[in-house]
Amino acid sequence: MITFVKKELTMLDSLKKIAIGSDHAGYKYKEYLKKYLQSQQFTITDFGTDSEESIDYPDPVHPLARAVDNQDFDKGIIICGSGNGVAIVANKYKMVRAAVCWNEEITMLARQHNDANIIALPARFISPEQALSFLQIFLTTDFEGGRHLRRVEKISQTL
């Protein structure tokens, strides 16, 4: 088991601009997380969806991932039923490293070892409280660099 120290999530952190989006399955979680982040004075841009009416998950994820890829945002949050669909779409973009996070250790390692810049949450498999906990870990865990930097740089290389 890896242990970690949860840092305080404040505006003193270098993160300020967060992109968030979901499909219908993740809508309630998106709204819950958005409300929390706004209460912490983060600047949030919501890429949709705006209801629980069924939509195709690539529709909100493509513009969100493109914006993270262009470094318009510090981090991104995407949510669908499994987390997989939204992560697959986001990872089409060269500088995006979207990680499906379903527990604290996976979330921490996604940041420490993979420098994930988008968290993908599986709304059908975690509670809203777990989603918030994972998001706090995601936003406060630093990338370790070192040997991991070399590996992360290889991710964005064109094949």
Predicted regions: what is each one?
Residues M1-T10:
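Short, Lys/Arg-enriched N-terminal segments with co-localized hydrophobic residues
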Residues L15, D72-D74, D115:
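Short, high-confidence coil segments that cap the C-terminus of an alpha-helix
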Residues I20-Q38:
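Glycine-rich phosphate/diphosphate-binding loop of Rossmann-like nucleotide-binding domains
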Residues G21, E104-L159:
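C-terminal binding/interaction regions
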Residues Q40, Y93-K94, N114:
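Short, structured coil segments at secondary-structure junctions
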Residues T43-S54:
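A short beta-strand-loop structural module common to alpha/beta enzyme folds
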Residues E53-H62:
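Structural motif
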Residues P63-V100:
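Helix-adjacent hinge/juxtasegments
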